Amino acid sequence: MQSTIKPVEYDRPVAAGTVCGVGQAWAKVPDAPSAEERAALKERIKALLVREKAVLVAHYYVDAELQELADETGGCVADSLEMARFGRDHDAQTLIVAGVRFMGETAKILSPNKRILMPDLDATCSLDLGCPVDEFSAFCDAHPDRTVVVYANTSAAVKARADWMVTSSIGLEIVADLHARGEKIIWAPDRHLGSYIQKKTGADMLLWQGSCLVHDEFKGIELDLLRAEYPDAKVLVHPESPENVVAQADVVGSTTQLIDAAVKFNATHFIVATDLGILHKMQLAAPGKTFIAAPTAGNSATCKSCAHCPWMAMNGLANLADVLERGHNEIFVDPAIGERARLPIDRMLDFAAAHKKRVQASGDLQRDQQLFANVGAA
C-alpha cells in the first residue's frame, strides 16, 4: 500500500496549559486506489466483515467511501460518542473503528470485552496530542477546588483524570448545570469550544490552550468575504472554530446538529465550517441543497489541513481490508484506566439521557428552538 507522509504542526500548550507552543507530528495518508482497485477492495471488505462477524463504525470526517461501506454493511456513521455507543449495543464482538485513536479507546472503554480494531493505530488528533496526561494532571492538581471537564477528543488516561467527559452536543448544557450549582471548572483541551461555552454560560472556567488542527484554520475575514458572494447562504459552524468564525454563524453545533440544521433550514445554500468529510452526510440528508466549504486560508496563504483532518485521511480502503484480513491494530486500554475513564463518560450519558427526556417532554417546537438558539447570538 503506497502512502504519502505529511508533516503536521499542532498547538502544543506549555506553561501548565496556559500558553500555546507548536508541536510536530506526521500523518501517513494512503494514496488513492484506482477505480478498479476501489471496487475490488469494497467487495473484499464486505466479505471480510461477514467472515469476521465484525461491524464497521465510521466517523463523519472519514472519506465518503468508508462512510458508504459502514451504511451498506449495517454499521454506523456518527460522531465519536455515538460510534462507541453503537458498538457497545451491537451484537458483534469485533468493532472496526474508522476514525482516530481516541475514538477507538472510547469504544474499548464502553465495550471492554470486545475486540476493537482500527485501520491505522497512528491516526491521532491534535487535541489529544496537545493534552499529555502528565502535564494535564499537574494542571489539575494545581487547582484542586475545580471540577475537571474534558472533551471527548482526549486520551483514555486524560478521561480517567476527569470528573466529566462531554461532547460538543451536550457540553454547553453540562457546564451550565455545573455553573448553576456553583462549581468552578477546568476545561480541556479545546480553547475555542471552551471559550464558546464560557461565554454562553458565564461559568468560571480555566481553559487548557489546545485546538483542533482543522477548525482552528477557519478564517473570519475570508468567511465574511465568502458570505458576500453567497448572501442567502446559511452559515453552519462547529464550536471548535475561532470566535470570529463562530460569531458569523447561523447555527453553532456538533456534527449531528449541523446535519440536522442543513435538513431543517429553509435555505438552498450553506457555508460549512467543519471538516469536509461531513459534506457526504449533508448531501445525503439534504439532497438538492448546495454546501460550500468555509475558507481555511487567506490570500497567498497555505493551509495545514485544508478543512480535512490528515489523521482521518489515514483511514483507507486498503488498510481497512488489511486489518480485517490480519486482525492486527487492536486497541488496548489498561483496565484500571478504563474503569476510571468510564465514570465521567457514564456521568455524561446519564445526564444526556435525562436531558433528552426533558426536551422530548417539552415537544418538537422547543427542540427546534433549542437547535436554532444560536442564530444571531453566537
UniProtKB/Swiss-Prot annotation:
It is found in: Cytoplasm. The keyword Iron-sulfur applies. Binds 1 [4Fe-4S] cluster per subunit. [4Fe-4S] cluster binds at residues 125, 212, 309. Its cofactor is [4Fe-4S] cluster. Its main location: cytoplasm. It catalyses: iminosuccinate + dihydroxyacetone phosphate = quinolinate + phosphate + 2 H2O + H(+). It comes from the Bacteria. Iminosuccinate binds at residues 59, 80, 151-153, 168, 238-240, 255. GO terms for cellular component: cytosol. Signal peptide: none annotated. One of its GO terms (molecular function) is metal ion binding. Keywords: 4Fe-4S, Cytoplasm, Iron, Iron-sulfur, Metal-binding, Pyridine nucleotide biosynthesis, Transferase. GO terms for biological process: 'de novo' NAD biosynthetic process from L-aspartate. Pathway: Cofactor biosynthesis; NAD(+) biosynthesis; quinolinate from iminoaspartate: step 1/1. Its EC number is 2.5.1.72. Catalyzes the condensation of iminoaspartate with dihydroxyacetone phosphate to form quinolinate. Belongs to the quinolinate synthase family. Type 1 subfamily. This is Quinolinate synthase. It comes from Burkholderia lata (strain ATCC 17760 / DSM 23089 / LMG 22485 / NCIMB 9086 / R18194 / 383).
